[in-house]
Amino acid sequence: MMKAVTVETGKPETARLEDVPDPDPRDGSVLVEAVAVGVCGTDVEIVEGKYGWPPPGRERLVLGHESLGRVVDPGSAGGLRKGNLVVGIVRRPDPVPCPNCAVGEWDMCRNGQYTERGIKQIDGFMSERWRIEPEYAMKVDPALGILGVLLEPTTVVAKAWEQVVAIGQRAFWEPRSVLVTGAGPIGLLAALVAMQRGLDVHVLDRVASGPKPDLVRALGATYHTGAVGRIGFEPDVIVECTGVGQIIADSIQAIGAGGILCLTGVGSGGQATGLATADIAAAMVLRNNTVVGSVNANKRHWYKAGEALARADRSWLSGLVTRRERPERFASALKREPDDIKVVIQFAEA
């Protein structure tokens, strides 16, 4: 038996740390000891009963999709050795499969029958041990240590930039400026990757002080508060990381001609006001602007995310992990504190 954080999906206030059976070898030949699991808004929604699906025939789901672990037994995985740090790819292709899943593009699944660790029909990583198929285990640079837990959220950014570049190259395209809306983990990682691409980076968030503006400025980027329309320039690219309806609407109006607005998530930010459908059409049609949604991630995005983290300053990355909690305090980890950026549940030392 082992300890795991589980929840009865669809029912709030049912999350608990409990004893569960050791992972079944049928779940994968690679046995991993958990080091840390990142907490994000999706986990909170699942615990609140708003999202999530348990494995078939079960009522409870093991939480956690932002993983980091150490290989205990590599099994048949030729590229892994005992002691390697790894993270687990989250999404699995649908069983049909659809045309995209059939060629490894499961992030672009067309029929919605994909599954996801810790979210949809497969147990997650918030347990003392977990198993995984070798092809879904991503080796982590040991120099990252516990910061390897940032790999999964970085895949969100890697996929988003891939989409932005693909759209931009439909015509002559030399982007100079990018606005990132939201300075949470995804937004800060988006700013990091934009800086690595040599762009003039601006980040907008509602807080005026604390670790978020400090981290933005430490990157060499510009920090803004207030409305999107008051930043003083028209960005070539906006990476939207809040999911707030009004910010999305304002971003459509604020982006420069030929610009690209990439939406990286959904939220409960209410309805936008003051923007009619005709205004959206005018902004997009007359100025050749594009709005694209992006959900992570297939295998190449995990590799790209690893490359981005390997290039990043370790001390800056460390600033993203603002709180570490033990598994016994998972409930505290799920409750947001004012200066939180990335909270992790730590099972062991990296």
Cite the ranges covered by each PLM segment.
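C-terminal hydrophobic helical "lid"/dimerization subdomain
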Residues: 2, 249, 299-350
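Glycine-rich beta-strand-centered segment in the early N-terminal region that forms part
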Residues: 23-37, 52-99, 141-143
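Residue-level marker of beta-strand positions
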Residues: 66, 84-85, 100, 129, ...
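Mid-domain Rossmann-like dinucleotide-binding core that forms the NAD(H)/NADP(H) cofactor-binding site
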Residues: 83, 144-228
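NAD(P)H dinucleotide-binding glycine-rich loop of Rossmann-like/cofactor-binding domains
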Residues: 95-178
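Glycine-rich cofactor phosphate-binding loops and adjacent beta1-alpha1 units
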Residues: 167-174, 217-289
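Residues in the short beta-alpha loop(s) of Rossmann-like NAD(P)-binding domains
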Residues: 205-209, 267, 297
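C-terminal substrate-binding/catalytic core of Rossmann-like NAD(P)-dependent dehydrogenases/reductases
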Residues: 271-321
